[in-house]
Amino acid sequence: MISRIKSFKNALNYDKMNCIEIILRRNDLMSTSFENKATNRGVITFTISQDKIKPALDKAFNKIKKDLNAPGFRKGHMPRPVFNQKFGEEVLYEDALNIVLPEAYEAAVTELGLDVVAQPKIDVVSMEKGKEWTLSAEVVTKPEVKLGDYKNLVVEVDASKEVSDEDVDAKIERERQNLAELIIKDGEAAQGDTVVIDFVGSVDGVEFDGGKGDNFSLGLGSGQFIPGFEDQLVGAKAGDEVEVNVTFPESYQAEDLAGKAAKFMTTIHEVKTKEVPELDDELAKDIDEDVDTLEDLKVKYRKELEAAQETAYDDAVEGAAIELAVANAEIVDLPEEMIHEEVNRSVNEFMGNMQRQGISPEMYFQLTGTTQEDLHNQYSAEADKRVKTNLVIEAIAKAEGFEATDSEIEQEINDLATEYNMPADQVRSLLSADMLKHDIAMKKAVEVITSTASVK
């Protein structure tokens, strides 16, 4: 009986053996096996004992009991034996499996010492009354990382710690533009102006959903609308009616509009232009109440920019060193599922941010003229890079034997609480100890890479 595998990676040397099966038997009579199918891929087979199944069946029955009717019994009071006789216990199996499966699967993965990196594909092998259930799970495991050089790296960075007078002036000019006011313009609209418009769109004389707007503020040159729309409003004046003719992109989200010519009857209500304040001491006070003169503001901004440049320079060195460490490493057969999951995570995070701003996925794709596939492709390259980077940094942390102390975990919790302005106890409830330990070990690995790196 094997109770633990010390080196699972060596046991799954697919180059030497076509198929290896490892069997484990636990004290609770749960049996678990892993069959290697290919590099970083295999099938777990595991059983669920009756002492786990019976409570799950009870929970499944109690979940539906309140809705059950049977002659001679009040609604919700059907006895279990009557239910089993009338419907059969098997109708509870699916719900019971959903209850017991997560814990059983995690136990199997833990027993085998596998590092699973994607959602498994679960199949039922056997589910017989009164017997243990047998299930299989097709899994993808974390690939082996063969580290190259990651210490004393020499890197090149396209960054500087220097701050010029032009940098300071540019920052002040940005703030000056932010304080600009939109005023009514008595004349023709130009690029950079804002027009307030009504518009009605049609294709072949038929209006379409989402093609109408009233009192919409459109910045000319902002790229808010599909290509060609804004350019045709340059030169228009308040009171003008402009026929805007455009063609929807072939990749437009709304398939019924993609590639079609459209006409937008547009009414110009107002033309507005920016009026920027004078560059003087009064402007400086408006920008920052802690200064009295424009010169004071320049001194303050120089210090801020120097601090920011220092941080940007350090970040550039860190990024270049990590990139080189990743390039020096070899990742054995990176599973594509890891990339797909990272892409999906990024897309879901982005769309979640959009929805918090009141923009639905349908609205986003219609406004940008893109598709779900375009968005996935946009994040694909970055996802590939991020997954490889994380794998290499994890491997370095393991090679260096980095672990987190209790005091480091507590400090990390306090730092996060301060950063996100929430109680430390709330941080503890949101992040598990394992997550914190992992992040701290990763930070130590990054520190090893960057602290020993030098700039060419």
UniProtKB/Swiss-Prot annotation:
One of its GO terms (biological process) is protein transport. GO terms for molecular function: peptidyl-prolyl cis-trans isomerase activity; protein folding chaperone; ribosome binding. InterPro entries: PPIase_dom_sf (IPR046357), PPIase_FKBP_dom (IPR001179), Trig_fac (IPR005215), Trigger_fac_C (IPR008880), Trigger_fac_C_sf (IPR037041), Trigger_fac_ribosome-bd_bac (IPR008881), Trigger_fac_ribosome-bd_sf (IPR036611), Trigger_fact/SurA_dom_sf (IPR027304). Residues 192-277 form the PPIase FKBP-type domain. Its EC number is 5.2.1.8. One of its GO terms (cellular component) is cytoplasm. Coiled coil: none annotated. Keywords: Cell cycle, Cell division, Chaperone, Cytoplasm, Isomerase, Rotamase. It comes from the Bacteria. Its main location: cytoplasm. It catalyses: [protein]-peptidylproline (omega=180) = [protein]-peptidylproline (omega=0). It is found in: Cytoplasm. Involved in protein export. Acts as a chaperone by maintaining the newly synthesized protein in an open conformation. Functions as a peptidyl-prolyl cis-trans isomerase. Consists of 3 domains; the N-terminus binds the ribosome, the middle domain has PPIase activity, while the C-terminus has intrinsic chaperone activity on its own. Belongs to the FKBP-type PPIase family. Tig subfamily. This is Trigger factor.
